[in-house]
Every structure is written in C-alpha cells, then in structure tokens.
Amino acid sequence: MPRTFRNPILPGFYPDPSICRVGDDYYLVNSTFEYFPGLPIFHSRDLVHWRQLGHILDRPSQLPLDGVYASGGLYAPTIRYNRGTFYVINTLVGGTSKSGNFIVTATDPAGPWSEPYWLENAPGIDPSLFFDDDGRAWYVGNRMATDSRYDGHTEIWLQELDLAAMCLVGEPCVLWEGAARDAVWAEAPHLYKINGQYYLMIAEGGTSHDHAVTIARSGEITGPYKANRRNPIITHRHLGQDYQIVGTGHADLVETQFGEWWMVLLAMRPYGGYFYNLGRETFLVPLRWEEGWPVVAPGSGRVALAERTPDLPEQRWPAVPACDHFETQTLAPHWNFLRTPRDDFWSLCARPGYLRLRLRPERLTDLANPSFVGRRQQHMRFSARAALEFRPQHDDECAGLVLVQNNEFHIRFVITGGATPTVHLVKRSTPESNPQLMPIIPGTDVTLAELPIEGSRFYFKVEADGQAYSFYIATEPESWHPVAEGVDGRILSTPYAGGFVGTYIGMYASSNGQPSTNSADFDWFEYLGLDEN
C-alpha cells in the first residue's frame, strides 16, 4: 500500500500559501492579516511535515499595522528564490500609516529579513514575482479592471522589476481577466516557465465557496495568453456546502528534485453546518502534466483529506510542546499579537517562569494593540487550559482567556475585579450572520455567565466539541466548576462574522479604557488537539 498523509498540511488559519524549493528544501509562507509578527515561514524536506522557522516580518519597523481594521493588514504573499536571495512580495491593506505593495529579502530564510522596499505605482493585491532565465525580473499582480463593468471585475497585470533599484520599470500590460465569462475576483497570479512556455495560474470566483484555480499559457511573457479549455483545473464549488472540503483556490506550484509536481492551495473544512472556525487552511495535492497542461489530483479532480505521500524521503520535526511554561527568553513562534506592538505590554523576564501581561486601556473591541497573546485554533475538538495569577484592583480590570474571530465577534472568559472578583463569560456578536465577507458588522456584548470567585490564582479550561464550546474555572488544580457548557461557537466562523481569518485562542488583560499599573501573570498555557486522524 502506498504511504498517505493527512490534509491539511497546515491546519488552522494558514491561508494563501506560497511555496518555493531550494535544492532539497521547501519553504512556505502564509498571509496573516492584522496579526503580528507577520507572514510565518515554514520549512520542509518532504512537503508533508513542516516546522516554523519564524516570521518574515518580526520587527515593528517592518510592519505598521497601526489602526488596521479586522481582516485588513497583510494579504497574500509570494516567496521566491533567485541567485542566492529569497524574496517575499506582499500587500499591506488599510491602517493609518504605510500601505501598498512591498518586497523584503533575505539570504537565510530564517532571517533576518530586510526592511520593506515599498513599490510605487503598483496598485492592487496578491503580487507575485517571476525571475526569467534571461535574468529579467517581473512583477505580476491583480487590480481592478481599467474598464470595470461589474462588481469584482479585476485583471492580472505585468510589469518589469528593476531588482537593483527595487522599482517597476517599463510599461505595464494586462495579461488576463480570468477563464470564466465575466469572471469575478481574478487574483492570486503566479507565473511559471515550463518547457519554453509561460504559464499564468490564478484564482477566481472569490475566496469563498465559488473559489477556483484556472490557468493560461503563452509563448511570450507579455502574452497573449490562451486559457486551458479544461479550466478550472481545481474547484469544489460544484460539490455542495456539505462536502468535507470547500473553497479550494489560491494555489502555487512546486516541482520536487525528482520531477514530481505538487500544488499547495487553501481550502476550508466546514463543521456544524456551513461554518469553518479554523479558517482557510493549507492543503497539498498532486498534479501531472498532460498535453502541456496540469491535471490536478489525477483520477479524482478533488482535494482529499487522505492523499498519497510525495516521493520524497520522510523528514519529521520535533512536535511543538502542548504546554508552554514560559521558561524561555522569547515567545514560541506560534504566538501572535493583534496589530503592531508599540510598547512592551508583555514580559517573560519580569517574573521568570510566567508570561506577564500589563493591563492597558486597549480592549479587544478597539482597532488597536490590546494586551493579547494568542495562538490559532487548529482542531475542531480541542482542550485549552491556563493558570493565571491576578488580583483585580478596580471594576474595569480583567484578565483571562479569549476566543477571537475579530474585534466585533469574540468570547471573553475573564476574571473582573473590585472588592469581589467575578468570573465573566461574555459573547460579542450580532443576532444574525454577516451576509458578506467585508466590512465587519459592529457587534454587541451579551453576558453568558457571571459568578463570584475567591482567591488570586485561577485555572481556566475551554473545551470545544465541534461548534459547542464549554468553559470551566477552578481555584485548585482539576477542581473544575462549569461556567457555561455547549456555547454556540458559530460566531467564530467567517460565514457568520465575515472577514478572512480563523479563530485564535489566547491570554488577555485589559483595564477597559482606564489607566492601570496592574498586571496579570500566566504560569502556563496548554492546548491539546483532540481530532481523530
């Protein structure tokens, strides 16, 4: 029997994958939107097992996310390698300072990466780079069509890039508007040169249920491009909302050192109805070339949960520990913040063995950088626990755990203060789902549970069984008291809340608009995935 692996290769909120190979090593990056650090970079030797090297943008000077709205920030990146240098090109959307398309470079994929080279006169999103064998470099991206006739009418455009000056030169040209008649949201372009032909692969249909991957080719880089008559080369839009994998699209291709071809792409796994709290995830699917065109998932034409393993030597990496005791000098790379931190709101040194969060006025509902340290929900079933030492000094102060979809859709499970500490479980959402991905609709707070509690050391537990989330509190280890069980988690899914991101769970502290000198100390945080493979 051939070996198989389990999709997705990166579970949880890891959308818009881009991949490149250097020798026997593979590198992959994903979009991160309003989260900091930005753009995780992963390394693999077998395309199945991945380890995170760090982030492309890990310094505040590189990434001004100040004021970025929910699902703004860093959109789809592309990673490429050329003559000893790695390049990542990306788009920063929204915010109150810099925005637009930019390039960063490194000679080591683990970093450090350069400060951004911002590109002028480069409208649109989803930029990609192509290095031709004649030494010329090209920028390819998407933008609203110059003769826009309908909503979602975009075009793929090309312009030469001067690598020495990091600027676009020459005249831009339009390559394609997509395969479908009146195609919508032609985006995510990538160029490849194979056997003397230029291939332009894009996504269209929008990054939801109608998502698809299409391809065209030309003998000249500037076109004209002829579409594959068998487009789309991969989509699940015809399989219904109850299919186990939906929204397939936004792909990139890689050839192994042994001549096999593989595609990475995003997709979603709905559960509890057409809801996907884990967000858009990274999947891997084989392809082969027939009559000059790629055939994706030969024999089925579908992205599968179980797929044959690439013909590469297996290379596993040490597993990420389930429990973080905060005994190192830096946070593990799976931890993230909301937007760019402009002051030191967290510390691993103030109290060794603890993660200290300063209480600040910023709240989850603000388009700011609250005192939040979180990680992705990566499983439909999971258990998360944490130990917190905290003495609230005023009624406005709180600390605990939160489940975050965005600033208007989240669940706060916190200790609040004054003379008598209280456990508060608060859901922020809207009564009905958001009918569109953007913009995010303002929500309101609803208190789900409230009970007094004594002490200054608290144990939190959150369990998810599909869309049912349960919350427990204790003042002694394992002496759990139910706060609320079976809470509806669908508000944490983009089909309900809107936007482009997946659910985070993490640690949070706030003085809710008031000044404070207080802090909250987290002794440890544990996350256990309970999905059956």
What are these model-predicted stretches?
Residues 1-533:
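Carbohydrate-active catalytic/glycan-binding domains of CAZyme proteins
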